[in-house]
Amino acid sequence: MLSRLFQCRRLRFSQRVGRRVLSLLVLMGLPLAAQAEGFDNLSSLADKGFIIGAQAQLLGSGESLGALDPTRRLSPASVTKLYTAAASLDRWGPQHRFTTQLMATGDVDAQGVLHGDLVLDGGGDPALTSENLWRLVQRLRERGVRAVDGQLVVSQWRFGPVTCVTTDRCKARTRSDNAYSALLSSAAVNYGSWCNRVKPGSAVGGEASISDCATVAPLTRLDNEVKTVAHGGDTRLSAERISSESGDTLRVSGQIARDSFSREIYRASSDPAEQTAKTLMALLEQAGIEVESYATSTTPPPTTAKRLAAVDGKPLQELLLRMLNYSNNFMADTLALDLVAKPRAELQDAGDALMRFAQELPGHGVPTLASGSGLTPENRVSARDLNALLAAMYQRSALFPTFVAGLQLPTNGPMHFIRRGSDTFQQQVMLKTGTLNEPVTVRAVAGYFRTQTGRWGSFAVLVNGTSQTPYLAWRQVLPLVAADLTEMIKSR
């Protein structure tokens, strides 16, 4: 009995010494790739050639629970959005709203005719929708405006069109089969994407019906190759937006069952400011306000222009919830561009603003950030950098509730692919993931956790491939991270 008691005490002593040695190594900044204490499962990926940086710590005390090459800077992919969210909260606070306004370059006469241009001043709202534009039009009617003898001008003077720096966005200038590559403008609406609704036709074998989600009448040319099939049939749709000198064309093919509900299709537009102009022109026409033509502009409204109507967007806290939960690239890059003070901002200006914010955080090194979304593969941060960011936001009592609310719990978050690992991991970890497949594989995850005794911790894991490594699915990575974090959570 005494021998067993002695062995237990010796084991506990060895564990305490091991943890102290690990903490000392971390404080000294020594690499821990060879001693992956706390990340034993994750470190197995190194045997397959993947480059890994990881660190987990208790907040408040700063005690390290595990580290694996924590100072190595790697691509974080969409985990970059944590910097965008933090910098936005630091700049504006949770209740900030972006304002979009309609301005007049002339006067409105007694008959309701505006003698001049009607200017939409894009305020950089990352979630401006057709509904917001409809409200602007209704407020314009309330002011008695019935016609404009000039033209509608959509001003994107703050930023836009933003130079593309990633392959997907550069391709989107001519064609797009997705919405995540949407181009950027301070006057963009509906996340820079066309939304069209596909409904079954009136008879089997006939053409399906396609309409704009907001204005009903299509705002682009349509190449409709969707057929209506019998009740109970499969619904399969494929859509691509193609652009030419004459504008955007949406090519939709496939089939939709006669008893199917309508399906919505989102595809990035080739010119977000022009998309806004076309949408607003249609809404003005529906409201009975006559405008003959439209134009887009990169100059501010004249200083003599008068405000006729304005609409405030959703509070920043709601924007961040959507941006982080759904990893919305358009919203993230728009918010990062909003951080730039000068007009005609480009993505690198936004990256510079984020880097300045990051370098002011205690314990943070010098990152490389070329965008706020993480779409740019040049972005580089370390696991220690991310933990410094997470620790700094944890200390900001007025901002932390909004910041952490944007992270997902695997057990009930909107993204189902993270529902892996133990119940402890799924219910006690709040995280943001990042994924890139080109030019190399990136799987990154960072966030917070609660220990068994209720203490808060933070963690960051960066896994980057090389040209020689195989494809890496989340189902291969997340269970390893979950197993390691589960042990840490249970140990405290």
Positions of predicted regions on the chain:
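Conserved serine DD-peptidase/penicillin-binding transpeptidase domain
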Residues: 39-42, 91-364, 483-492
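Active/ligand-binding-proximal structured segments within catalytic/core domains
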Residues: 75-88
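Bacterial N-terminal signal peptides
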Residues: 21-31
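Small-residue-rich helix-loop
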Residues: 65-67, 336-492
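N-terminal secretory signal peptides that target proteins for export/translocation
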Residues: 1-16
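A short glycine/serine-rich beta->alpha loop
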Residues: 68-74, 266-267, 373-376
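Short glycine-rich loop/turn motifs
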Residues: 51-54, 320, 332, 443-446
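Beta-lactamase-like hydrolase cores
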Residues: 34-76, 99, 134-143
